[in-house]
């Protein structure tokens, strides 16, 4: 009797699991679609920074936002691992991160060129180029050393 009862309970449990298969696939696909979405709507500054302090603040804000982007990408990859790995979704997540970095660089490049054109002193221009180059390196690599280099160079430029 115990064996029959155990068999019935086990069969019921397995049939219940089998019935959830299609529903789980729909849920999994919905999660894949959500993880694959990419928002490239990165705000361009409403007004171009007019002085070195404003430009330094702009670069620092963009660096912080890029770090937040990297955090979101990492969390999406972790969620993907929990849901079930899918190569095309992983590629979409990685591509989104790259596209967001490139969009930030493109926006900042336009601002940088405008600030550079308005900078007259050779030392200040050198510090500006150095700070912007360190910012680009940090945005690309997101390493602690690159962050330290960026912070140092942008502080020097801002306080000239």
Q: How should these model regions be labeled?
A:
Residues 2, 19-29, 47-50, 94-106, ...:
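Intrinsic low-complexity, intrinsically disordered segments enriched in polar/basic residues
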Residues 11-12:
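Repetitive helical segments and hydrophobic/amphipathic motifs
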Residues 15-16:
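C-terminal motif of bacterial Sec signal peptides marking the signal peptidase cleavage site
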Residues 21-92:
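Immediate post-signal-peptide N-terminus of mature secreted/exported proteins
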Residues 149-160:
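Short, low-complexity, Pro/Ser/Thr/Gly-rich segments in the mature regions of secreted, periplasmic
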């Amino acid at each position: 009797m115990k064996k029959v009862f155990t068999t019935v309970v086990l069969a019921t449990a397995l049939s219940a699991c089998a019935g959830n298969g299609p529903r789980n696939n729909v849920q999994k696909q919905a999660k894949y679609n959500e993880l694959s979405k990419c928002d490239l709507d990165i705000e361009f500054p409403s007004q171009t920074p007019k002085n070195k302090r404003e430009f330094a603040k702009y670069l620092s804000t963009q660096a912080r936002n890029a770090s937040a982007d990297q955090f979101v990408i990492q969390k999406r990859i972790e969620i993907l691992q929990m849901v079930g790995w899918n190569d095309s979704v992983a590629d979409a997540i990685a591509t989104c991160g790259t596209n967001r970095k490139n969009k930030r660089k493109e926006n900042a490049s336009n601002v940088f060129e405008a600030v550079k054109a308005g900078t007259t002193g050779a030392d200040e221009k050198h510090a500006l180029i150095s700070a912007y180059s360190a910012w680009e390196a940090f945005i690309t690599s997101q390493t602690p050393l690159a962050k330290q280099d960026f912070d140092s160079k942008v502080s020097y430029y801002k306080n000239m």
